[in-house]
A protein has these predicted regions:
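FAD-site-proximal beta/loop scaffold in flavoenzymes
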Residues: 25
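AMP-binding/adenylate-forming catalytic core of the ANL superfamily
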Residues: 2-5, 10-11, 20, 32-119, ...
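Acidic/polar alpha-helix N-cap and adjacent early helical turns
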Residues: 145-157
Length: 157
């Protein structure tokens, strides 16, 4: 999604990220969006959260929504992890509802009914919580740091 208009700032205040975000008068938001035939715009993902696996794109948001539709899942975040053959693969980080006894295998079977086989995460990690910003958005950079402690062999780019 790119934006341009008189209401769009021409630069970030004292921020070196201006060069990446502002190009030729356009603000590159970092969002992936689709436009309906009626002209409505729907933001579907963030470019930094898309997972490129074997040349195909996997939406982390769609996987998160599929996982969170399971009745025993409280919340879920999906991140890309490096893979020697496929470049990146999804890793699901899941917080279960209190008292849940669902297993990885049961969650995978649940996902198999909802997404393409190549979208299935390589692993599911159960966590007590997913780090969030002050407004409740997932802090995926912090989540990657936490996951690297669990999987020290991973090197995030």
């Amino acid at each position: 999604l790119r934006l341009r208009g008189p209401w769009i700032a021409s630069e970030y205040y004292r921020d070196e990220r201006t060069a990446d975000a502002m190009k030729n008068g356009w603000l590159y938001t970092g969002d992936i969006a689709v436009r309906s035939k009626d002209g409505y715009i729907k933001i579907t993902d963030r470019t930094k959260d898309l997972i490129k696996s074997g040349g195909e794109w996997i939406s982390s948001v769609d996987l998160e929504n599929a996982l969170m539709s399971h009745p025993e899942v409280f919340e879920a975040a999906v991140i890309a992890v490096p893979h020697p053959k496929w470049q990146e693969r999804p890793l699901a980080c899941v917080v279960m509802k209190e008292g849940s006894t669902v297993t990885k295998e049961e969650l995978m079977a649940f996902l198999e009914e909802q997404v393409a086989k190549w979208w299935l995460p390589d692993d599911i990690v159960f966590l007590d919580e997913i780090p969030k910003t002050s407004v409740g958005k997932f802090l995926k950079a912090k989540l990657r740091e936490n996951i690297q402690e669990i999987y020290p062999q991973l090197t995030f780019g």
